[in-house]
From Swiss-Prot:
Domain FeoB-type G: 1-161
Any one GO molecular function term: ferrous iron transmembrane transporter activity
Pfam families membership: FeoB_C, FeoB_Cyto, FeoB_N, Gate
Membrane topology category: Multi-pass membrane protein
Residues binding GTP 2: G33, V34, T35, V36, E37
Protein name as catalogued: Fe(2+) transporter FeoB
Transmembrane portions of the chain: 281-301, 342-362, 382-402, 425-445, 452-472, 516-536, 544-564, 567-587, 608-628, 637-657
Length: 664
């Protein structure tokens, strides 16, 4: 099967094009740093495989995710490259395009965001550009799919009759050095003359990953040649001279290809940015937007729908299943397992799907509109005080959906200590798995202020992440503040198709989790409540679950929720935070009173909020722990990521409850 890779700058629509060409769905967002690892999809019409590589401005990697690109181009086998560029930022995008052309591999250029360029009054004669580069160019609008069908039909012809032809003349002295380097590379390695020239150029540009691919003897020889030509060029260094020549080439190339308008048509966008990123009013606007989202999720739309679903699952559906099982003569043990274990456990989580869908819809809307990137800029000013940059806030925002991709997104951070700090604090972000716990308790104890209470938990998670990062960056992970540079994407009206796909995929993942982790956890919890030291079908107060819960309940007694039932729910919470709710449903369904009534009797508003604080901050779920181990390559950091949140959760919850208990 033929392999093709898709490359481009961050936030030019690579993943949108990947989805359009493969029919799959990968997470997309109107901001940079969404793709942090290689993703593979099967092209439609069985054309081959498409590899989506992380966005990069240059083939000299400065962050962990960018090393994936250079490593793939040097070491993997592929039939051709699809370089997607932003038509509204063509000059800047051509920096990477030129480097890819210097590979002298079959390449197509996808001219994306033609619609954005047109709205700005930018005119591009892509036919003329195609003739100049001798490379096929396809205008597309990846987010709507316009032009992608034509591109898909042509991909199978990529490379047919291809002849290497691209070459920039870097001047006599540098070209002589490149020639000498090529001879060394071809003699000492298996690279052909085109690969050798590419390697030589990248070596002169101080691409350290290229140097790492070569043996020390070759590196020493090439370094000697680079040092010699460094002294010969008039510029500060050979790298600066080559960059100057390359920039001149691009300017000449685009001179009669791109026509810009006389006046700036982004004036309105700039005015909005001055308000949304204002150092005084920007943050209140963000908090107001988040309050509005939570108000819609928990009061206006989400909760009423969840109540209807809860009534259906707990009533009509459960009664129907019982009737069918009685008719079929299913043994009592299985009947109890299915109704009191599986339906009660999984159903108690599924009832929150409407709220999850509403929340995901609005988060996707903020992402696709371009607003989230502005929040990263806004937070950069604040995060400097805590030893981080705005680039760390991007993974943190992703953590509102799930902590696992947020930890992986930290690859885009160049500074290794800042990357590690971000990984360690990311689990404090309120992921969707915690949302059912919040929804259950705020619906019982804080009906009049549900949105404010949930917002306070999200804000608390961010504050605790900042405080911990301050400690880490001043002690074991001390580092200099990094400069945060981010490209603010164009504001755009969110695509209904994109919003639907994004919301659907996230909700589907939540439901899929209910069918795996939560299903398994519910079965185990029910069995532990069914079996005890004295046999099976015992009273729950004599079960193994009661024994485990009593031990942990004793430990959390000072936190305000020291019942054995609450203690028993904390252990499976390590598997997945949603299992906490399913465990409660199973444990409390063993009695005659309903879940809501029992929780009202065992918790107070104070202890309920304390419980939510503990759930917010304590041990990350097993998937998150696995992601931390994968990204840090260290059991030491992984152990720290498990232990310190538990200690933090215990101490903060203790302080909150004990002080609150003095006044309530």
């Amino acid at each position: 099967m033929e392999n093709y890779c898709i490359l481009g700058n961050p936030n030019v629509g690579k993943t949108s094009l990947f989805n359009a060409l493969t029919g799959s769905y990968e997470y997309i967002g109107n901001w940079s740093g969404v793709t942090v690892e290689k993703k593979v999809g099967k092209l439609k019409e069985n054309v081959g495989q498409l590899i989506d590589l992380p966005g990069t401005y240059d083939l000299s990697p400065i962050s962990k995710d960018e090393t994936v690109v250079t490593d793939y181009l040097l070491n993997d086998s592929f039939s051709g490259i699809i370089n997607i560029v932003d038509a509204s930022q063509l000059k800047r995008n051509m920096q990477l395009t030129v480097q890819l052309l210097e590979l002298n591999q079959p390449i197509y250029i996808g001219l994306n965001m033609i619609d954005v360029a047109t709205k700005r009054g930018i005119k591009i004669d892509y036919h003329k550009l195609m003739k100049k580069l001798k490379t096929p160019i396809f205008p597309v609008v990846a987010r709507t799919g316009k032009g992608t069908k034509h591109l898909l039909g042509e991909i199978k012809h990529l490379g047919e009759g291809y002849q290497p032809h691209f070459k920039i003349n870097y001047g006599e002295k540098i070209e002589e050095t490149i020639k000498n380097m090529c001879q060394i590379i071809m003699t000492e390695t298996s690279h052909d003359k085109y690969q050798a020239r590419f390697i030589a150029i990248q070596f002169l540009l101080n691409n350290m990953q290229i140097a790492n691919e070569l043996n020390s003897e070759v590196v020493n020889k090439l370094s000697s040649l680079r040092d010699q030509v460094d002294k010969q060029v008039e510029a500060v260094s050979v790298r600066r001279e080559m960059e100057r020549i390359r920039n001149h080439y691009i300017e000449t190339l685009l001179q009669d290809v791109v026509t810009y308008p006389d006046e700036d048509k982004q004036y309105f966008s700039s005015r909005i940015d001055k308000i949304l990123t204002h150092k005084y009013i920007g943050m209140p606007i963000f908090l107001a937007i988040m309050w509005l989202i939570f108000q819609t999720t928990f009061t206006w739309i989400g909760t009423p729908l969840s109540d209807q679903l809860d009534a259906f699952i707990g009533g009509t559906f459960t009664d129907s299943v019982k009737t069918i099982m009685n008719y079929l003569g299913v043994i009592p043990f299985l009947q109890d397992l299915i109704t009191d274990g599986i339906i009660a456990g999984v159903g108690s989580v599924l009832v929150f799907v409407p709220q999850i869908v509403v929340l995901f819809f609005f988060i996707s809307l903020l992402e696709d509109s371009g607003y989230m990137a502005r929040i990263a800029v806004l937070m950069d000013r604040i995060m400097e005080s805590f030893g981080l940059s705005g680039k760390s806030f991007i993974p943190m925002i992703i953590g509102f959906g799930c902590n696992v991709p947020s930890i992986m997104a930290a690859r885009s951070i160049e500074n290794e200590k800042e990357r590690l700090t971000t990984i360690l604090i990311a689990p404090f972000m309120s992921c969707s798995a915690r949302l059912p716990v919040y929804a259950l308790f705020v619906g019982i104890f804080f009906k009049e202020n549900q949105s404010l209470v949930v917002l306070s938990l999200y804000v608390l998670g961010i504050i605790m992440a900042f405080l911990v990062s301050t400690v880490l960056t001043k002690t074991i992970l001390k580092n200099d503040n990094a400069i945060f540079i981010v490209e603010l994407p164009t504001y755009r009206v969110p695509s209904i198709k994109t919003l639907w796909r994004s919301t659907w995929e996230k909700a589907k993942g939540f439901v899929r989790k209910a069918g795996t982790f939560i299903f398994g956890g519910s079965v185990v919890i029910w069995l532990l409540s069914y079996v005890g030291p004295h046999g099976i079908n015992v009273n729950i107060n004599q079960s193994f679950l009661h024994m485990v819960g009593s031990f942990f309940g004793m430990l959390v007694q000072p936190l305000g929720f020291g019942t054995w039932q609450a203690g028993a729910t904390l252990v499976p919470g390590f598997l997945a935070k949603e299992v906490i709710v399913s465990s409660m449903a199973i444990i409390y369904s063993s009695g005659d009173a309903g879940l809501v009534n029992v929780i009202q009797n065992q918790f107070t508003p104070l202890s309920a909020y304390a419980f939510m604080i503990f759930i917010l901050l304590y041990i990350p779920c097993v998937s998150t722990v696995a992601a931390i181990r994968k990204e840090t390559y260290s059991w030491k950091w992984t152990a720290l990521a498990v232990v310190y949140p538990l200690v933090t959760a215990y101490v903060l919850t203790f302080i909150f409850y004990q002080i609150g208990h003095l006044f309530v």
